[in-house]
Every structure is written in C-alpha cells, then in structure tokens.
Amino acid sequence: RLNETVLPTVIATPDNYDPTHEYGMVVLMHGFGSHMGDLAGLAPLINETDFIYVCPNAPIEMTIGFGQQGYAWFPAGGQTEPDDIDKAVSQLQTSVDFAIDKYRPNQSNIYIGGFSQGGMMTMHAGLTRPDIYKGAIILSSRLTQVDLFTDKIVHLDKIPIFMSHGTNDLVISIKDGRDTKELLDEYGYQIEYQEYPMAHEIREETISDLKDWLSKN
C-alpha cells in the first residue's frame, strides 16, 4: 500500500529501474471481481523498459465464490448510480496523484487503461482528464452511465484511444463494444479499434496491437 489514503496498488517498474530517469506511466485497472495483480503481469509484455505501471485495487470488496475475494470499482449492472462512479473516480485519482508524486514520471507520457469494468473506469476517469492522460486503453468494455460521461467530456480535448473486443464475448457483448465505439466516434475521439475471435479475455494479438499503438501515440 502506497499509504493509507490511497487504494492498495501494485507498482511494476522496469528491471533496471533508475529513480533519476523520467519514465512514462501506465495506469491499468482490473475488471469486476478481480484484483490489482491481474493486469500487472501484462507490464513486461506491453513495454518492459519505458514505463512504470500502476495497478490499483478496486475499493469494493466482494465474495466471488469458493471463499475467494474479488473487488469491484462500483456495483454492477442496473445497481450503478452516478455517485458510485464519481466516488470510484475520486478514489482512483487520489491514488494516481500519489503515484505520480512518488515516481515522478514524464508528465506528458501518462496513459490510463483497463479491462471490462476497468475499461468503464478508463472512460469516466481518463477521458475526462485530458490534462493528465496522453491516451486511453479500453479492453473488452462498454460505456455505462452515458449522460454522466457525455456531460463531462463534450467540451474537453479528445485523447487517442486503443479499443479492443472479442467477437465471442458473452460478458460484455460485441454489440455493446461497437455501440460504445460509435458513441466515442461521434464525440470526436480518434480510436484504433480491433476485434478478435475471442471471448472476454486479453490475448497475445491484443497485446501486440496495443504495443504498436503505444509506440505511435
């Protein structure tokens, strides 16, 4: 834990980490029912030399069966209220601010991304803060609380987005992914959008395309 006021967080640094060097930073948020360690393993696959990865734990504890603990950013489905999202966004931002202060990344090279519910958070916490983030990564996700989101971003600068989805996704349908992409298109976002013949998951092809996108954006 970075300190008591922020979310528990896994920090992944390059192997030969030099605290005097100004690295980029990537904030990665896990999905509903998962935990902060879930996406940390992607760090060396995405780029193992140029970035510090910040993987916060979602704030809401939940039981996911077999005695296992999981975590959520906000209540799922129809139970989600705008206040739930605003609270999660605030908690996330406190944690990101702390990590930025501690690791001193290149302020013009900070990205935010997430998988599933973490992708929803990316839209609400990342696309609303073009003053902080250079680009956004939305993996197998969809937009929730559309009005809350569009009210905030309508007059903001639009950061580039990498977005991917599996055509066989049974958790968040490919239609929901495509509808979200279309809405973001309408608001002027530049999106690299990829579909893969996969379920609700992240595959090597996703990482390969994401690496290419990061190198160009």
Predicted regions and their residues:
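Active-site loop signature of alpha/beta-hydrolase-fold enzymes
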Residues: S34-H35, E61, T144, L170, ...
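Short beta-strand/loop motif that positions the catalytic acidic residue
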Residues: F162-H165, D169
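Serine-hydrolase catalytic machinery in alpha/beta-hydrolase-like enzymes
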Residues: N3-P105
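Alpha/beta-hydrolase-fold catalytic nucleophile elbow
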Residues: N57, G113, I137-S140, S164, ...
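Short, conserved loop/helix-junction motifs that constitute active-site signature segments
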Residues: L45-E48, K152-K158
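C-terminal catalytic histidine-bearing segment of alpha/beta-hydrolase fold enzymes
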Residues: F162, K175-N217
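Primarily recognizes the serine-hydrolase "nucleophile elbow" in alpha/beta-hydrolase
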Residues: S108-L156
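Conserved alpha/beta-hydrolase "nucleophile elbow" surrounding the catalytic nucleophile
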Residues: H30-F32, G113-F115, G166
